[in-house]
Amino acid sequence: MVEMPSIGKRVKLVADGPAGSTSREGVVLPGAAQDHITIKLANGYNVSYPFDMVKTIEEIGDSSTSESANLSIEQNQDLPKVTIIHTGGTIASKVDYATGAVIARFEPEELLASVPEILEIANIDAKKIGNMWSDDIRPVHWNMMIDACQEAFDSGSVGVVITHGTDTLHVSASALSFAFAGNGGKPAGRIVFTGSQRSSDRASSDATENLLSAVYWAANGSEVSGDGDAAVTVMHAGSGDGICAVSPGVGVRKMHSTRRDAFQMVNGERISEISISREGLSHTPVSKSQNREVTKPTKYDTAIKIAQFIAGPHLHSDLIEAAQKADYSAIIIHGTGLGHLPIENSNGDAPENDELANTIEHSSIPVIVANQCINGPVDLNVYSKGRNQQEIGVLGHGSTASPEALLAKVHWALSNGKDLTILSENLCGENESSLMN
């Protein structure tokens, strides 16, 4: 058997296959299976062969993970200043050929070296908050992002780009929208969230176009109005390349686990689209009528806990009771249809429905309903069941926000002493009133 090279070596191998011998060049990664050799090809894809299929293998060099670590890159100080705030995710990452894993690449020099076109758009500053999976992000990290954005604006940045894992990117975008515009104001510059659905080691990665478009919008986008654009997301508009969508942070949601165009609007429209071509980047016109004043951001009380449940056959009163006993501050239930809950017992054979209704009516903490349909309003005036829910104290009627935007809104309201009757109001673009007419 041919002697296998160590991980990280660049090799040329010849292996047997169903169609005969095949020659491949790439970098050796940890084997995808026992007794296999795996190499990363120049096109970004990985291939694996059983050891006994490899006829010859030749080392042709090493692959370094730090080849750009000591780069000194000169920036154009005349361009708009944009601060990139990194929280994690794959958008600012590269392959560690010693382990085969995707690792953070967030020294500013390395980031600029990987996407040098950014230098033609903006003068880049960078700050690293962390390198977290987005599902590990908590309200304390929202506050860190808020502070980092305000510091960037205070230091002269016209916009910030927050690189973020995609799974909860829309949740953080909602949180910052309320922080900067929930009180009727707006941030001093553009706040742009972006991420990558496909890791940067894949040929189909969306990282470069998303990052380019996000920096472009942070530097050159429309003036912030505070109504839907206090924080925006910039991600692929379709499955193909060339167009990225600018969407309200409070109006967008990740709707697919893997597609590059996973981020879709909920009950609203995109703000703009950015075209990427050989001639450069450009965006469709934007018209905004509001003229809010720039205000300092508010924060989130990290001691607040909000329970979330799903309405359906297994929603029972003991869940509501448990949340109260555990000192939760509020409960959000993702209701069916127009926001309904299983609280009626018309046949007389479902006493758990009566128990649920009684527990909600006497709850010591707010019980709020969101729309598990995602699109459409919570309208508790259409059917008698909805009116009954309002009579026992269920809140949320009139909201058209996504469940994630509603979660951020409830947390923001509780953190800042607001009455939860504001859930039906449009504070910063989260509610589309036309859906209730």
Where is each model-derived feature located?
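A glycine- and small-aliphatic-rich helix-loop capping segment at beta-alpha/alpha-beta transitions
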Residues: 98-105, 174-192, 207-213, 252-255, ...
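Accessory alpha-helical/coil subdomains and C-terminal extensions
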Residues: 85-86, 96, 107-108, 113-118, ...
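Short beta-strand segments
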Residues: 85-87, 162-164, 192-195, 229-236, ...
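Short Gly/Thr/Asp-enriched flexible loops that form oxyanion-binding sites at enzyme active sites
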Residues: 162-189, 343-356
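C-terminal non-catalytic interaction/assembly regions of soluble proteins
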Residues: 2-75, 338-437
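ATP/NTP phosphate-donor binding region
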Residues: 5, 36, 45-46, 53-151
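Internal gly/pro-rich beta-alpha loop/helix module
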Residues: 47-49, 195-276
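Gly/Ser/Thr-rich loops at beta-strand to alpha-helix junctions
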Residues: 86-92, 164-170, 238-240, 337-340, ...
